[in-house]
Amino acid sequence: MEVTAHYIGGKPFVGDTGESFATLNPATGEVLAHIEQADERVLAHAIESAKLGFSVWSSMSAAERSRCLLKAAQLIRDHNDELAELEVRDTGKPIQEASVVDIATGADVIEYFAGLVNGLGGEQQSLGSNQFFYTRREPLGICAGIGAWNYPIQIAMWKAAPALAAGNAMIFKPSEETPLSALKLAELFTQAGVPDGVFNVVQGDYRVGQMLTAHPEIAKVSFTGESGTGKKVMADSAATLKPVTMELGGKSPLIIFDDADLDDAVSAAMVANFYTQGEVCTHGTRVYVQRAMYDAFVEQLKERTEKLIVGDPMNMETQIGSLISKSHLEKVLGAISSAKESGATLLTGGFQVTERGLEKGCFVAPTVFVDCRDEMPHVQNEIFGPVMSVLVFDDEDEVIARANNTQYGLAAGVFTQNLSKAHRVIHQLQAGICWINTWGNSPAEMPVGGYKLSGIGRENGQETLLHYTQTKSVFVELGAFDSPYA
């Protein structure tokens, strides 16, 4: 099988590094491609290419950059089905998700920043009759994006959109588990007229990430991944004082009060745990249900969860796809075993699905544990699989304290018909992304990111564009220079 490589300088690039790795379809075990591992020479070539691209791109007007990005967004939409299928084969997620969410929401973000950048400007202020100052918002230079494997192309677009809109170049490293869709995205940027070298893709494992974060010519790093790796990214970046944006792990609370709509609450809990087979950092895996609703909630949850369809991700009927890898499958099954040993009651699921031709994949039945306690390992630790923990609570103050008793602070949600209560509770929850009577919505206009060990900085929204710029202040004297020296 031919080795697939990088995308540098507006075209595919093979560095002849002598090292490669296979990327698999996790649902079938099929080898999709062999990917070249980048080395120092490949990265050096990407840096030089990005320098050239940056010199051209940053000299273009905001309107010119906006037109290129809008064309790219339309090309991405035109290739929605092709990109969705590629994403499904590389991640194992259901096509019914990828075909309507992953590609479209990424294109939304590109369009959003393409529109926003036209209003990006500085300020001017008079300091008297002969003096004034003005500021300029200037691009940083070459930015690095390091992606995760659960939403590969969406994450690539979320990172590229504000960086490119502000006039920067980007070197993007996808996860070695899901390296394919970023290459197609790079092609589409080139087709849209984005200058060569502005968006480059380098492939490889953690070693490539370390080279990027430590490189003195990388001006900023945006990373999505787990919290432990995020600490290493931040430490490496600190050596050259480069700013970082990090969207990290979570163990988010979903709080359901007894006045909530039961059907909606159960629906939200299922989406917040089983969407993308549980491999979503913002998932609400700690589901707190007020005692008066608990029994009815658990009864409906069990019935509806057992109707979910686990199957071939390319089948439009499938609702639960394959986990990303055999090693991750073992991790999730290990967490399920630990939950049983800790005394939680298995309500449903809890096993690997192997029938109907799924034996070569990494499928886990949607799993729900009840009779959970806050100190149980599966309640405290991020599992990143279709495993829900249901906990009972009695009053508002109690559940707020319990919900906040975690090292993470990525997301939180509240279901109640009392909007005063909803806002009161949300304002006390230590989380950066919050929902009231819904779960998971993340429009381009809304900044997203975490508190505590769940991250630094934000993606999407107006403030993100500013983080890809630096402020230059210019003081102007119109009169004679007033020197203190004779």
Swiss-Prot record:
Coiled coil: none annotated. The modification Cysteine sulfenic acid (-SOH) is found at residue 281. The keyword NADP applies. GO terms for biological process: glycine betaine biosynthetic process from choline. Signal peptide: none annotated. Its cofactor is K(+). Keywords: Metal-binding, NAD, NADP, Oxidation, Oxidoreductase, Potassium. It comes from the Bacteria. NAD(+) binds at residues 147-149, 173-176, 226-229, 249, 281, 382. SUPFAM superfamilies: ALDH-like. K(+) 2 binds at residues 241, 452, 455. It catalyses: betaine aldehyde + NAD(+) + H2O = glycine betaine + NADH + 2 H(+). PROSITE patterns: ALDEHYDE_DEHYDR_GLU. K(+) 1 binds at residues 23, 90. Pathway: Amine and polyamine biosynthesis; betaine biosynthesis via choline pathway; betaine from betaine aldehyde: step 1/1. The active site is at 159 (charge relay system), 247 (proton acceptor), 281 (nucleophile), 459 (charge relay system). Belongs to the aldehyde dehydrogenase family. Involved in the biosynthesis of the osmoprotectant glycine betaine. Catalyzes the irreversible oxidation of betaine aldehyde to the corresponding acid. Dimer of dimers. HAMAP family: BADH (MF_00804). This is Betaine aldehyde dehydrogenase. It comes from Vibrio vulnificus (strain YJ016).
